[in-house]
């Protein structure tokens, strides 16, 4: 791994700015379901479960700096592995927005006894996940199905809840109803970045342009004040892709309240 020199960094920042000024860049939301179906369908057809967005750029982010010579996928897996070891020890573990299921393999390697469930809104994803021997089911963040989670389950998302933008409350309500033991997020969280720093500012602007998660941590903090959840961790991972510092970490759990007789 090497930090970019001044000339390389200036060139990279210009490239980021060009993306931010490009009006053809698509934004997230329910309208993009067909594109995700097509993308995961290509992975299904090829038999390769690595998402195509990995390796798109030779430059990544590390501790607030631009670097080269790193493998973004392996950097992300280091986060998934460490969080799985610490938090995902349950008998049933659910990934929401699992895509090709590549993160399910990582979690299964850590918790070999767990039953893994991969939920996604595309049929191609469910075919991939079921072919891997996991439980693949249809689930839409925007309109959560009434699928009951197993008791004391572990839940996680990796760069998938980002697609909901500001429409995440239905999903949170679904989780509060099902009361998993823990919820692990690896997602772009603008509240955790420092807008007074150039690369963070550009990352926040990219999140806004793509209409990624906005106000999610703030919403969770409001729920915590109301006594509905407990936030265990909320921090940056120090790892990101070229355009975005998108692998921040939030860990929370619902608070169980006994009913008065």
Outline where the language-model segments fall:
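Short conserved loop adjoining the S-adenosyl-L-methionine
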Residues: 144-149
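A short SAM/SAH-binding and catalytic strip from SAM-dependent methyltransferases
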Residues: 153-167
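A short glycine-rich, Lys/Arg-flanked "PGG" loop and its adjoining helix->strand segment in the class I
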Residues: 170-181
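Class I SAM-dependent methyltransferase SAM/SAH-binding core
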Residues: 100-143
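Conserved class I S-adenosyl-L-methionine
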Residues: 90-99
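Glycine-rich helix-loop-beta junction characteristic of Rossmann-like nucleotide cofactor-binding loops
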Residues: 82-88
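Conserved beta-strand signature within the Rossmann-like core of class I S-adenosyl-L-methionine
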Residues: 180-192
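N-terminal accessory regions of S-adenosyl-L-methionine
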Residues: 1-80, 200, 208-211, 222, ...
